[in-house]
């Protein structure tokens, strides 16, 4: 004959596992809420560090690259040589790819 488990031991194991599950769930919720609170404080700390840092060298580089983009490096003759606007033909009429 096979030995049947007692109903009390089965209920004891179920209650023990459920208590363990609830404990783990509460501890997980507490650690994630603590991390979120510490993340908010660390953002304030990062703002303080950023306020003490001098960003002007980076801003000067940004202005210089914008000026280089705005100034034309090619003359009109060279530009006309590469992109010959006089000989450019644009097709007109219906698009042959659309039926």
UniProtKB/Swiss-Prot annotation:
Tell me which residues are glycosylated.
94
Residue runs in coiled coils: none
| Keywords for this protein | Developmental protein, Differentiation, Glycoprotein, Hydroxylation, Secreted, Signal
Q: Which residues carry this modification: Hydroxyproline?
A: 91, 94
Segment forming the signal sequence: 1-31
The cellular component terms of Gene Ontology attached to this UniProt record, alphabetical and capped at eight, are:
apoplast
Instruction: Tell me yes or no: is Nuclease among this UniProt entry's keywords.
Output: no
Question: Key word Cell membrane present in the record?
Answer: no
A GO molecular function held by the record: receptor serine/threonine kinase binding
Top-level taxon: Eukaryota
One GO biological process from the UniProt record? maintenance of root meristem identity
Q: Which PANTHER family match?
A: CLAVATA3/ESR (CLE)-RELATED PROTEIN 10, CLAVATA3_ESR (CLE)-RELATED PROTEIN 11-RELATED
> What family, per the record?
Belongs to the CLV3/ESR signal peptide family.
Question: Any idea what this protein is called?
Answer: CLAVATA3/ESR (CLE)-related protein 11
Write down the species.
Answer: Arabidopsis thaliana (Mouse-ear cress)
């Amino acid at each position: 004959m096979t030995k049947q488990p007692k109903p009390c031991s089965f209920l004891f194991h179920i209650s023990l596992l459920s208590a363990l599950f609830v404990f783990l769930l509460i501890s997980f919720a507490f650690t994630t809420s603590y991390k979120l609170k510490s993340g908010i404080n660390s953002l304030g700390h990062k703002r303080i560090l950023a306020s003490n840092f001098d960003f002007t060298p980076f801003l000067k580089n940004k202005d210089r690259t914008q000026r280089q983009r705005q100034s034309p490096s090619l003359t009109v003759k060279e530009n006309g040589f590469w992109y010959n606007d006089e000989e450019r033909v644009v097709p007109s009429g219906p698009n042959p790819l659309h039926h």
